[in-house]
Each structure stands twice: as C-alpha cells, then as structure tokens.
C-alpha cells in the first residue's frame, strides 16, 4: 500500500510520477482537489523516514499545529483543516536531534498551545525555519520573547490584504525581536488577488523600509499582468 500525496494542481506542477510495484495506491492532498479522507491516525503520526531523501538528512519536517481561523479566500487551510488552530503533535514526533527543523504550521500563533510548543522548539536548540507565515497580528511582547529563545534560521510573515495596514504590527515585532538580519525576517506579499500595482509596490517598499525582506507571491500566475510578473522577478531576485 502506497500513499501518494500532491500539493499543487496542474497550474504549477504536472502529476507525472508513477508508482510501481504497489498493490494499492491511495492518492490524496490538495493537488487532487478539495475533500478527501483523512489519513489513518497511525499514518498521520508516524515518524517521517528521512532516509528516503538523503540530501535532506539533518533536517526535520513537520507540523505542531493545524488549522487557521482566518478563512482567507485564496487559501484552502481553513476549509481543509478547520477554522481553529489546534495542537496535533509534540516536537518529538518528527524531530530526534536533527540540526534543523522546517516547521510547516499554517498559523502557529493562533494555537492556544503555541507558548508550550515554542518552548519545545527553544529546548531543542535546533535551527528553526518557520516556513509558513506566522500571523503578525497575533504577535505581542510575550510571544516575541518566546520566539527570541528559539534558534531561528528564518521567520516568515504575510501581508496578503492591501486594505489592511499592518505597519504598526511589523514595527512592534522589529522593536522586540532578537532576529537582527532583515534577510531572516521575511514577508510573503500576495499579488494578483484584487490588489493594484500601486498597492503591491506600497507593501514591498514599506516592508523594506521597516527592515523586512518581502517575497512576492502571485495568485494564479498565468492570469497575472506582465507588470506583476516583473515586480515578482525584481523583488524576489
């Protein structure tokens, strides 16, 4: 029995991988569309076999929490995982001494247990990459102090809605964070989702002025105007 997962649809990646030598293949994941059954508990919570990917040995990947209360129209997380952020694992489930941790949680700071989970990350002394956008609106001096105890490789936030001015939230984080390099304070900037070029440029320039490294994300890239694709290339390179 083989479980075959897929993250993206044909817009971004073709489903070209063929599974051989298996009596049964169960396909799932967002790349195959909404819905689908949850994985059995023992599969969901099995420790990843990192030896399948030798070039990534030394790095642990996993979720401590799932779900997000924001229910953004461009994002599938709330519909797929629920509109509450809940703890789903302890760090020991997918980390056993690796030097680096890639954390995949969609909205860790919205989880009621986030302080304890940050404590687990800090105690690991591993280098942590918060790969998904932490919710800048949920940062405060207390949880920023907890984040400061974590050996952080990079922290990612997001400024998706141009109608929402997040400037003061980003200022507060910079004032309290121990992350000194702007290259390690990264912000996803969503474009081609109802925003104008002027609004996109404003967010990029504001973030740079505040000491962040913006990263332009294009919604449905094939439909994006040329100026947006040029902006992405200019900012991300």
Over which residues does each language-model region extend?
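N-terminal pre-triad scaffold of radical SAM enzymes
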Residues: 48-85, 98-105
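Generic structural signal for well-ordered alpha-helices
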Residues: 13-22, 118-119, 144-147, 167-177, ...
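Flexible glycine/acidic-rich beta-alpha junction loops that bind and position SAM and/or redox cofactors
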Residues: 112, 192-197, 215-237
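Short catalytic/ligand-binding loop motif for oxyanion handling, primarily in non-cytosolic enzymes
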Residues: 10-13, 33-37, 70-71, 81-83, ...
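Glycine-rich beta-alpha loop elements in corrinoid/cobalamin-binding modules
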Residues: 1-59
